[in-house]
Amino acid sequence: MKLHKITSIAVIMQIKKILATLLFLLLTGYISAQSVGLVLSGGGAKGISHIGVIKALEENEIPIDYIAGTSMGAIIAALYSIGVTPDEMLAMFRSPEFASWYKGEFEKGYATYIYRREPTAEMVGVSLTNEKKNKLGIKLPTSLISPFPMDLAVKQIFASSAAVAGYDFNKLMIPFRCVAADIVNKKPFVLRKGDLSSAVRASMTYPFLFKPIIVDSTLLFDGGLYNNFPWDVMAKDFNPGFIIGSKCSGNAAEPDTEDILSQLENMLRVETDYTIPQEKGVLIDILLPGVSIMDFNKVDEIYRVGYFNTLRYISGIKSSIKRRTTQKEMLKKRMDFRTKTLPLRFADVHIPGSNLNDSEKEFIINTVKNNSSEVFNFEQLKRGFYRVVATENVGSIYPDIKIRKDSLFDVYLQIKKNAPMRLSIGGNISSSSLNQGYLGFQYNRFSKNPWRASADVNIGRFYSGLNLMLRQDIGIKPLWFYEAQFTA
């Protein structure tokens, strides 16, 4: 009996050891497999603080297995997903090129002056269109900032990486998600695949600042309108073991009678849930009370706030996440992905499904390609793109870039013609006798060899005059035209 009892105790002790070992293996297995998702809110220039968050996490070897963002958060998240380092992001946001992108200004060295008219006294101008038969309508601008520099920039940054991933956001260096706003159905639009640059461009399209774009037949605006902090998308799509959220913006403040942007924000935005359940992760709340959405001249100040704010959370994050990713491992991961990307070399230009006729398409394609059939690079594409914009014959032009089987790329241009007529008024109102009035009219005829005619009338006590002008562009390479003017 005594032997049997001792044997039973020994068996129980052995079972306990086995169970303890299994439990230890399960726990260590969970820890080693614990995945981490990073979610970045929108916030305009405040979103630069996310770069500081990423820098602090990387320095402390906190892994980032998935990343998602909205608006400015989508830009930072997408850059990280293709292997751009925090230091490289900072250099980009400090650059004069970035300033031209968000201001809508042509980059120096790319502006085309040969198509520009002589300056006039115009103060206000409206475009007139006859798109509806037998009806003349006014065409108002849809954005305050020219979208062309930003459109080209996102293509240059993201096109090759998207091709490497097979246009699947799960196959980027870091799997990625972003959110735009479907204003027709009034709901968030989650972007999981397709053209990465268009996904980013859609997510940061703040109403009235930037022109909206169409993705998958849906007109999309800034994702912050309906979901400014997509932690729910992160949880649903990736289900990471731990979520780190970086929040640099809140819900819309009370509207101000003197601030039209605050009024629009309250009209358009719905409230976002910024609360990450404690069992799912942690929220890094970054306060930037003196920074507005367009304060991109405060890059270093905003970055430092994000960086040092994150350091306050690091000990808690480390206790929740036992896995570590060394900087050497991150460097290898970046190099493995980035070395697969291809230089942007283009074979052809296409204009699918537009309201342009064949001669108009021919002019645009020849202008972009500089009347050449040879392979061309991104710099040549940019020059040709800006030449087309400078002609004032197109109201919108958005490039899509897709890889071919021969590892070259093709450009697909989404184009809408500009209104053919423009009416301008201006002048000078003075308490003295120096009053001056101006009235102008311009008509553009778009074709393979486009022409335009204009009439400008100035009326005043000291000067009155009439100027008539006719110009036609004949060649592209070399670029030449003829022009006739009459002044009275």
Region roles according to the model:
Residues 6, 26, 30-32, 68, ...:
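Intrinsically disordered, low-complexity regions enriched in small/polar residues
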Residues 1-15:
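N-terminal secretory signal peptides that target proteins for export/translocation
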Residues 32-70, 78-386, 390-397, 401-403, ...:
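Patatin-like phospholipase
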Residues 9-10, 18-30:
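Sec-dependent N-terminal signal peptides
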Residues 379, 384, 390, 396-488:
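Gram-negative/organellar outer-membrane beta-barrel architecture
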Residues 15-19, 64:
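Structural motif marking the loop-to-transmembrane transition
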